[in-house]
């Protein structure tokens, strides 16, 4: 495998060089998860899934997020997991630096960096955040990832569109104008007409309406909070930034669509 050639090929179709290097790292890890027999114990989430869904170079992501399913999050278990990836890959995969505990509001997980090298010594580095899939009522579905290391792609467990939408919405509601995840607003717009509304309604109930730490109990309450956020001058300005606006739709259309969509999910 020649990472240098793959970077050149990806930049030719619109990827920035850093994003191309990150995609290589992610795709090597995805392929190794399948090859190592861990596909039933890991579910992929976050930007890697959104990038896979959209197939858009502008939605490329730098980091990787995953949850273990029925697998320990101890450092020993993580080290064993990475050694398994390395043993079942044509590339070298190793942990770079210490494994760090993550504690962010309700989230508990681990962060590590993976150093991945090809046969020519070309190295790429990616950050991997690992958590535990604890909501057993939230089904994980197989998703086909198109990867640069195998034209056949790989099928792995991943968060559904509905779960991704519900989690991004919950984060925005909690943080309000303090949120810096402006790209999430465009992600939710993209997902809004691609979901099963009955499933989404149930997930909104699980993630938001039934959560005692959340204030919102109805679609109207969600819309009131979103309106407050979208009306903030600084938030609006950041939302228009081309760094975050990966869809060629105005931020005003995006926010209006989201408000109307939320009201329709009953």
Specify the residue positions occupied by each region the protein language model found:
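Structured mid-to-C-terminal alpha-helical surface segments
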Residues: 1-42, 52-60, 64-266
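Glycine-rich beta-strand-to-loop/alpha-helix junction loops that act as flexible
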Residues: 44-48
